[in-house]
Amino acid sequence: MSEPEKSDTDRIFVHDFVLPVRIGAFDREHDAPQQVRFNVDARIARPARVPERLPEVFSYDLITDGIRAIVAQGHIHLVETLAERIAASVLAHPQILSVTVRVEKLEVGPGSVGVEITRAK
């Protein structure tokens, strides 16, 4: 029996993170925040050894704190712009190799609408 192939990366993710966001290009969207769902998957270099303490790992709090900081900067016209800013924020961390960001506006129509982007260093 062959040994499974080892990956040189791990994945850290934040899924179904929802915040009120001032977003939208239309005048009617400037009046109040909308609920927006964020899904972020980031690839990090696999550590040389199994981490045993929090300072040895990339914390998902860095992702959620980054999203909160971007949203707090004020009104954003496009989900594409928001996704790009989040991707840049995550990629600014040296451990991150690539990131996929999905941003969904939850209050437009009967479902959700949004964008998903993948960026790498």
Regions found by a protein language model. Give the residues of each.
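N-terminal, polar/charged subdomain of small-to-medium soluble alpha/beta proteins
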Residues: 1-121
